């Protein structure tokens, strides 16, 4: 009997009978996966999770609202305990392709992007069914196009703009905007950002740029200023700084016998990724001029202990420069600290130094907010958008070259009244913390209620 039925009719019957199977099982499996009863967000950073503080703050803030957070990125160091111990946050470790000599940098970049594409697709397939995906930009390639494609599952896209990826690449190619790789990066950011449901920026200047240059919807763009998280606090008044310096395991080995903060010796700190947009040479040059001032003009200048935290491609170069110089009044230490010890170090310092200049001229260094939260006035390299954060002689000092930095260091080291004024203003500034600022911005975007 079945043999007499036309093939087209048999196919139609099979198709008709398979509709419930497709609708109730296949489509939910493909697009929703293990859909959670909680609101669920994927947070993606193509960087080290433990040293991506703003991304970690996002994860913690969503978790506090009861959301299920899927935090994706490289885990190259110990995760902050507040992340690893949070039952609402699941960390997904991505493998990172490391360069092992041989081959040109362009070939390696292509291999790395292809490796990232496969890794991201695999991970997003496992996490399908999420309500939102938040990606950090930069980098934009390959995560931004993939995140836009992921919207087909019904997921809404949030881009957290830390900077412009093409501007960082442009810096690498000596400012050449028309280099093919720079143009590709620019087009990827401009085109795919239009598909975002929400855009968060770190400055008002960046928000205006995205609206005017990328023609993004103003209603979908909001400024979420970096603010210090709760772990960044000034040193409690009942704790002796000198005692802490000589007893805390993470720092005591750097404190020489003749160094005494109670006798006026000072500690400064800078955090850096040792990239071209942060010239550590300016700080080293200023400290050399300080040394010269001590020898030739003012023997009353206090000792300076300078901590340089972080790691990156130019670190070895600067370490060698420090080793080759005969320091008499300054001691410079390169350190790499855990997420728990870094706030403790800031508590013990007098001033923070920021050498960030911004490849785009539109972002702000988060390290300054960490320093403010710890009660540190900041001596910062000046560029136009910095006015959104640092006001000269109010909550910090500004400079444009090593000589101005040297002059700022002299004022900072010797003028106790200036220090007290700056510290008071910084303490007031730091009262506005991340969580309250985050919730206010998210409500304005109607992301939360």
Curated annotation (Swiss-Prot):
Q: What sections of the protein cross the membrane?
A: 8-28
Q: Place the motif Dolichol recognition on the sequence.
A: 21-32
> Record's PANTHER family?
BETA1,4 MANNOSYLTRANSFERASE (PTHR13036), CHITOBIOSYLDIPHOSPHODOLICHOL BETA-MANNOSYLTRANSFERASE (PTHR13036:SF0)
GO molecular function, a single term:
mannosyltransferase activity
Q: What else is known?
A: Present with 1890 molecules/cell in log phase SD medium.
Q: Which residues lie on this side of the membrane: Lumenal?
A: 1-7
Its pathway is:
Protein modification; protein glycosylation
Q: How does it sit in the membrane?
A: Single-pass membrane protein
> Which Gene Ontology terms of cellular component type are present?
cytoplasmic side of endoplasmic reticulum membrane; endoplasmic reticulum
Q: Name the major location.
A: endoplasmic reticulum
Lineage of the native species? Eukaryota, Fungi, Dikarya, Ascomycota, Saccharomycotina
Impact reported for residue 356 to Q:
Abolishes enzymatic activity
Intramembrane extents:
105-125
Q: Which UniProt keywords apply?
A: Endoplasmic reticulum, Glycosyltransferase, Membrane, Signal-anchor, Transferase, Transmembrane, Transmembrane helix
Q: Which organism is it from?
A: Saccharomyces cerevisiae (strain ATCC 204508 / S288c)
Q: What is the effect of changing residue 278 to K?
A: Abolishes enzymatic activity
According to UniProt, the reaction catalysed is:
an N,N'-diacetylchitobiosyl-diphospho-di-trans,poly-cis-dolichol + GDP-alpha-D-mannose = a beta-D-Man-(1->4)-beta-D-GlcNAc-(1->4)-alpha-D-GlcNAc-diphospho-di-trans,poly-cis-dolichol + GDP + H(+)
Protein name in UniProt: Chitobiosyldiphosphodolichol beta-mannosyltransferase
Q: Broadest EC class?
A: transferase
GO terms under biological process = dolichol-linked oligosaccharide biosynthetic process; protein glycosylation; protein N-linked glycosylation
Q: What's the stated role of this polypeptide?
A: Participates in the formation of the lipid-linked precursor oligosaccharide for N-glycosylation. Involved in assembling the dolichol-pyrophosphate-GlcNAc(2)-Man(5) intermediate on the cytoplasmic surface of the ER.
Q: Which family does the record claim for this protein?
A: Belongs to the glycosyltransferase group 1 family. Glycosyltransferase 33 subfamily.
What CDD domains does the database record attribute to this sequence?
GT33_ALG1-like (cd03816)
Q: Which InterPro entries match?
A: ALG1-like (IPR026051), Glyco_trans_1 (IPR001296)
Compartment list: Endoplasmic reticulum membrane
């Amino acid at each position: 009997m079945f043999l007499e039925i036309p093939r087209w009719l048999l196919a139609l019957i099979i198709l008709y009978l398979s509709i419930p199977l497709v609708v109730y099982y296949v489509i939910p499996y493909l697009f929703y996966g293990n859909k959670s009863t909680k609101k669920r967000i994927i947070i993606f950073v193509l960087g080290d999770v433990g040293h991506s503080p703003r991304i970690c703050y996002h994860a913690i803030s969503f978790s506090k609202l009861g959301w299920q957070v899927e935090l994706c990125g490289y885990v190259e160091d110990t995760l902050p305990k507040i992340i690893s111990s949070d039952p609402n946050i699941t960390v997904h470790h991505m493998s990172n392709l490391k360069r092992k000599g041989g081959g040109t940098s362009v070939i390696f970049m292509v291999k790395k992007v292809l490796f990232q594409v496969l890794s991201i697709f695999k991970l997003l397939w496992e996490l399908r069914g999420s309500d939102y995906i938040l990606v950090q930009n930069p980098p934009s390639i390959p995560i931004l196009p993939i995140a836009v494609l992921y919207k087909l599952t019904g997921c809404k896209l949030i881009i957290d703009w830390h900077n412009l990826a093409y501007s960082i690449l442009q810096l690498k190619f000596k400012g050449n905007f028309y280099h093919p790789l720079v143009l590709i990066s620019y087009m990827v950011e401009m085109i795919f950002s239009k598909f975002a449901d929400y855009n968060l920026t770190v400055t008002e200047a960046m928000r205006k740029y995205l609206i005017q240059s990328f023609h993004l919807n103003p209603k979908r763009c909001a400024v979420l200023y970096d603010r210090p998280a709760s772990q960044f606090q000034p040193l409690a008044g009942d704790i002796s700084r000198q005692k802490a310096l000589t007893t805390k395991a993470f720092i005591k080995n750097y404190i020489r016998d003749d160094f005494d903060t109670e006798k006026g010796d000072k500690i400064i700190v800078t955090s850096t990724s040792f990239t071209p947009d942060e010239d550590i040479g300016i700080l080293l040059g200023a400290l050399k001029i300080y040394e010269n001032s001590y020898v030739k003009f003012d023997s009353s200048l206090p000792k300076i202990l300078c901590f340089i935290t972080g790691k990156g491609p130019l670190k070895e170069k600067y370490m060698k420069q420090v080793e080759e110089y005969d320091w008499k009044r300054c001691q410079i230490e390169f350190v790499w600290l855990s997420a728990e010890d870094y706030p403790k170090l800031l508590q013990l310092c007098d001033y923070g130094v920021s050498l960030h200049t911004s490849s785009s001229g539109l972002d702000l260094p988060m390290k300054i907010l960490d320093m403010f939260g710890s009660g540190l006035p900041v001596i910062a390299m000046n560029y136009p958008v910095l006015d959104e954060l640092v006001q000269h002689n109010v909550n910090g000092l500004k400079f444009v070259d090593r000589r101005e930095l040297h002059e700022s260091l002299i004022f900072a080291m010797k003028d106790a009244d200036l220090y007290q004024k700056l510290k008071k203003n910084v303490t007031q500034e730091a009262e506005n913390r991340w969580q309250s600022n985050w919730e206010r911005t998210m409500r304005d975007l109607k992301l939360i209620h």
